[in-house]
Amino acid sequence: MSNKNKSYDYVIIGGGSAGSVLGNRLSEDKDKEVLVLEAGRSDYFWDLFIQMPAALMFPSGNKFYDWIYSTDEEPHMGGRKVAHARGKVLGGSSSINGMIYQRGNPMDYEGWAEPEGMETWDFAHCLPYFKKLEKTYGAAPYDKFRGHDGPIKLKRGPATNPLFQSFFDAGVEAGYHKTPDVNGFRQEGFGPFDSQVHRGRRMSASRAYLHPAMKRKNLTVETRAFVTEIHYEGRRATGVTYKKNGKLHTIDANEVILSGGAFNTPQLLQLSGIGDSEFLKSKGIEPRVHLPGVGENFEDHLEVYIQHKCKEPVSLQPSLDIKRMPFIGLQWIFTRTGAAASNHFEGGGFVRSNNEVDYPNLMFHFLPIAVRYDGQKAAVAHGYQVHVGPMYSNSRGSLKIKSKDPFEKPSIRFNYLSTEEDKKEWVEAIRVARNILSQKAMDPFNGGEISPGPEVQTDEEILDWVRRDGETALHPSCSAKMGPASDPMAVVDPLTMKVHGMENLRVVDASAMPRTTNGNIHAPVLMLAEKAADIIRGRKPLEPQYIDYYKHGVHDENEGAIEVKPYAK
């Protein structure tokens, strides 16, 4: 049925992580008509590749779930094109990601708040919104850092496989600490991770926010609805046109909110004449607002896997045997338990790569299995691996449309490894990871390094390996960043979430982040959307909560850490 001439108070372009939050929160006002337009299909309850946590590797690269983006040839990665999976389904990338929940370090948000006009995005103002969205089963009811009644149900990784405990102990032996909660008082250290898995199923943003709200009469959700154009009268957005089932539909809107993510949002802005004027003219597009920051400041996390052979038969490697998969799948279908009921990213840590760094700049994900994200397993009977990479690369990329065609994918480049600081941190990251994996606590299991292998030792050999094997951690952000109007590269007003120079066009998604955070970015995107919902609705914001958190050089180095007995063989 065509929605031609139908009018909505809010049209949200994108039913991903941020769009799901907004669809729920904005439709709480019963007198407001809300439309969510998702270009992908529905996240069906019966779809095992979405709902089964351990099936997370299957949607990537599959056109039914993934937009299958790729960068242009990366000039500092040997000319490689780096594949980028983005969710083409309700829930967006929260329906195909690794389900890891990490807020980032509190100092990330202190950095957000440094520019004039960004003061309400410091940690004290963001913390109440993190708590609002969380239901943290792994935290004590009195834990003032964590939320206990939110829609996102979080499972604390049990990390019962002996490889996890040995890895945590190895971190302590290497001179680091163990922390009870990387989202609590102390991020720095090693310990279990929270995951967006509830009762053995993926807890996506759409499952948590959008599906419970769909019974409301004032909320409409359209899937397979690809927005081709935003309509304007001067500086005011008046509606959108979208294509569904081969037909074009035009609807009117009092407000248009872009929640398409770090790729689609800057693409739509540029197609709408919002961006660098000279570049837009070169593509035959009449400039509407000159905002040279659209598509710039692009950030991402790059990562590699350091893989080891495991001497003891304790890893999950046998679960990759195709003969065992039917049993594992049936166990999950009937009981929601077993190897398929976990994302297996149950623990890891955050450390500083050197003593000059104020707070952690390296992230580790540990897996009791040796396998690539595409499902390619190492040729060993048993293995394990650690994912590692710098969190604050100062390399910056860009996204630029290639033409006026909304269906043509844009030109994407992240410029990985383009700075000396970036390369320095990468060498440190690999050396820190190897040091941890070589500690005595790992001796009972350490059967030797598979990848990159002992032949990779010098700084240049390490960088060559990263250039060959580095993959995106799938955390693109900051391509339409928040910032005051005095910042020539800012795109979004941090007080209103409106695009600078526009009256009723807003951006709420990862593209609006001013800087990436230390960790997986799904939790920060949910927080940003929760906070933005109050801004858009004109509600009084939640009261800031000024709570002390661990700072290196300020607190005792052991404060908030768990005492671990030294490993004794």
UniProtKB/Swiss-Prot annotation:
List residues binding FAD.
9-38
Q: What is its EC number?
A: 1.1.99.1, 1.2.1.8
Molecular function, one GO term:
choline dehydrogenase activity
GO CC annotations on file: membrane
Query: What processes in GO biological process is this protein linked to?
Result: glycine betaine biosynthetic process from choline
User: Pathway membership of this protein?
Assistant: Amine and polyamine biosynthesis; betaine biosynthesis via choline pathway; betaine aldehyde from choline (cytochrome c reductase route): step 1/1
Gene3D superfamilies linked to this entry: FAD/NAD(P)-binding domain, Glucose Oxidase, domain 3
Catalytic activity reads:
choline + A = betaine aldehyde + AH2; betaine aldehyde + NAD(+) + H2O = glycine betaine + NADH + 2 H(+)
Q: Sorted alphabetically, which keywords does the UniProt record give? A: FAD, Flavoprotein, NAD, Oxidoreductase
Q: Which residues form the active site?
A: H475 (proton acceptor)
Q: Which InterPro entries match?
A: BetA, FAD/NAD-bd_sf, GMC_OxRdtase, GMC_OxRdtase_N, GMC_OxRtase_C
Superkingdom of source: Bacteria
Look up the record and name the cofactor or cofactors this protein needs. FAD
Q: Which family does it belong to?
A: Belongs to the GMC oxidoreductase family.
Question: What HAMAP family does the entry give?
Answer: Choline_dehydrogen
- Protein's job: Involved in the biosynthesis of the osmoprotectant glycine betaine. Catalyzes the oxidation of choline to betaine aldehyde and betaine aldehyde to glycine betaine at the same rate.
- Which NCBIfam families does the UniProt record give? betA, PRK02106.1
Record PANTHER family: CHOLINE DEHYDROGENASE, MITOCHONDRIAL, GLUCOSE-METHANOL-CHOLINE GMC OXIDOREDUCTASE
Q: What protein name does the entry list?
A: Oxygen-dependent choline dehydrogenase
What high-level taxonomic lineage is stated for the organism? Bacteria, Bacillati, Bacillota, Bacilli, Bacillales
The gene designation is betA
